[in-house]
UniProtKB/Swiss-Prot annotation:
Belongs to the ATPase alpha/beta chains family. It is found in: Plastid, Chloroplast thylakoid membrane. This is ATP synthase subunit beta, chloroplastic. ATP binds at residues 172-179. The keyword Chaperone does not apply. GO terms for biological process: proton motive force-driven mitochondrial ATP synthesis. HAMAP family: ATP_synth_beta_bact. PANTHER family: ATP SYNTHASE, ATP SYNTHASE SUBUNIT BETA, MITOCHONDRIAL. InterPro entries: AAA+_ATPase, ATP-synt_VA_C, ATP_synth_F1_bsu, ATPase_a/bsu_AS, ATPase_alpha/beta_chains, ATPase_F1/V1/A1_a/bsu_N, ATPase_F1/V1/A1_a/bsu_N_sf, ATPase_F1/V1/A1_a/bsu_nucl-bd. Its EC number is 7.1.2.2. It comes from Phoenix dactylifera (Date palm).
């Protein structure tokens, strides 16, 4: 932790003795810089280019040292566009890694990768900054308490419950609902959550970032009248940013979250959308730095880069960071190196299925692919565990019977199997749920369902008490009482039509 009340910029530390170099080569977002003998900067040091281009426009580009090439030359990756830079321009070595503002002054504001506010609300009033590169907490500092984090989403709470202070991954291909699910989790958890939240937008759509900001202002998570009372800090490095910014914006968000955990001793929520873009940016940078690509063209340092980010997201005896990360799955292939490397670090995985999304079942969470280390009788209790296992067994049996149904039809199944299929189809629909953040699209009001209500609903379906109700009564409802009420309404409507 460093306090530098003298600097206006959060990036550059005090530069009494300037260590100056000159640009020798520019290849897109990568710069080669020559320094005087014996004055070489360290790896991860921030370099700043302050100059004017040919038409007199001010240039202010920050880079990060990635390689020491020899012959007094270093290779650095730019955190913003390199337009207007020329060979021979002066480069200042700041003598320290990128540092960003941390603490209460960051709440309610939007930052870029350098920790500069980008919301047009004036400068951030903070004197406390922290470097984005830090080591993970020591093993002895870690907290090992196990407790459930209730989300109000039926399929998550029942089949793959989240751990308080754990790491959670939302896996899915393009357009199956990762961002909507992460928005709903922000809505359900961040609003009811007493602590603070940090949202890292890594390489995703600018429009979604803007929507989230507006949504948070409307809901009061960001307090416009008194910004200091806000509960969230936003850090964006969107799709249009250079790979250097997308590669480091996750670390900027994490650094802000770590301060709340370690210094303020708070419980923090860290949302990252999307962790795949962090890997993708690392892959782009790796190729630009001339490293030999590894499997499927990814960087050879994939596991190391992922580990250095994920190991810092943890709970210590001071406070906790509960992290929810969206993970894009290229071509719906979960064995792709990027999602496969992420799996190893997570306590719970929520896998979104294109098949369910095509059926119109939202959230399209696959009940069989989603997993959680918390689903154990000693943690969640016997009743919850037994119900979850029976739901999974029924879903698995239905999946096995689908080929037979497709070829021979339902009538060729045994009585027992027909009953299993009917209950599985009801459960599949009951796992859907109207979301608060999707109200404007669906026209249905959002529903928050407590864990006890969720367990009761599935027990009633499994016991056979609701076998007489139609399937559509279970679609997009909250608790089981709404399903029975919907069934009665459907019955009345059908009688009126006759």
């Amino acid at each position: 932790m460093r306090t530098n009340p003298t600097t206006s910029s959060p990036v550059v530390s005090t530069l009494e003795e300037k260590n100056l170099g000159r640009i020798a080569q520019i290849i897109g977002p990568v710069l080669d810089v020559v320094f005087p003998p014996g004055k070489m900067p360290n790896i991860y040091n921030a370099l700043v280019v302050k100059s004017r281009d040919t038409v007199g426009q001010q240039i202010n580009v920050t880079c990060e040292v990635q390689q020491l090439l020899g012959n007094n030359r270093v290779r650095a990756v730019a955190m913003s566009a390199t337009d207007g830079l020329m060979r021979g321009m002066e480069v200042i070595d700041t003598g320290a890694p990128l540092s960003v503002p941390v603490g209460g002054a960051t709440l309610g504001r939007i930052f870029n990768v350098l920790g500069e506010p980008v919301d047009n609300l004036g400068p951030v009033d903070t004197r406390t900054t922290s470097p984005i590169h830090r080591s993970a907490p020591a093993f002895i500092q870690l907290d090992t308490k196990l407790s459930i984090f209730e989300t109000g989403i039926k399929v998550v709470d029942l089949l793959a419950p989240y751990r308080r202070g754990g790491k959670i991954g939302l896996f899915g291909g393009a357009g199956v609902g990762k961002t909507v699910l992460i928005m709903e989790l922000i809505n359900n958890i961040a609003k009811a959550h007493g602590g603070v939240s940090v949202f890292g937008g890594v390489g995703e759509r600018t429009r979604e970032g803007n929507d989230l900001y507006m949504e948070m202002k409307e809901s009061g998570v960001i307090n416009e009248k008194n910004i200091a009372e806000s509960k969230v800090a936003l850090v964006y490095g969107q799709m249009n940013e250079p790979p250097g910014a997308r590669m480091r914006v996750g670390l900027t968000a994490l650094t802000m979250a770590e301060y709340f955990r370690d210094v303020n001793e708070q419980d923090v929520l860290l949302f990252i959308d999307n962790i795949f873009r962090f890997v993708q940016a690392g892959s782009e940078v790796s190729a630009l730095l001339g490293r030999m690509p590894s499997a499927v063209g990814y960087q050879p340092t994939l596991s190391t880069e992922m580990g250095s980010l994920q190991e810092r997201i943890t709970s210590t005896k001071e406070g906790s960071i509960t992290s929810i990360q969206a993970v894009y799955v290229p071509a719906d292939d979960l064995t792709d190196p990027a999602p496969a490397t992420t799996f190893a670090h997570l306590d719970a995985t929520t896998v979104l299925s294109r098949v369910l999304a095509a059926k119109g079942i939202y959230p399209a969470v696959d009940p069989l692919d989603s997993t959680s280390t918390m689903l154990q009788p000693r943690i969640v209790g016997e009743e919850h565990y037994e119900t979850a296992q029976r739901v999974k067994q029924t879903s698995q049996r239905y999946k096995e019977l689908q080929d037979i149904i497709a070829i021979l039809g339902l009538d060729e199944l045994s009585e027992e199997d027909r009953l299993t299929v009917a209950r599985a189809r009801k459960m599949e629909r009951f796992l859907s749920q109207p979301f608060f953040v999707a109200e404007v699209f669906t026209g249905s009001p959002g529903k928050y369902v407590g864990l006890a209500e969720t367990i009761r609903g599935f027990q009633l379906i499994l016991s056979g008490e609701l076998d007489g109700l139609p399937e559509q009564a279970f679609y997009l409802v909250g608790n089981i009482d709404e399903a029975t009420a919907k069934a009665m309404n459907l019955e009345v409507e059908s009688k009126l039509k006759k």
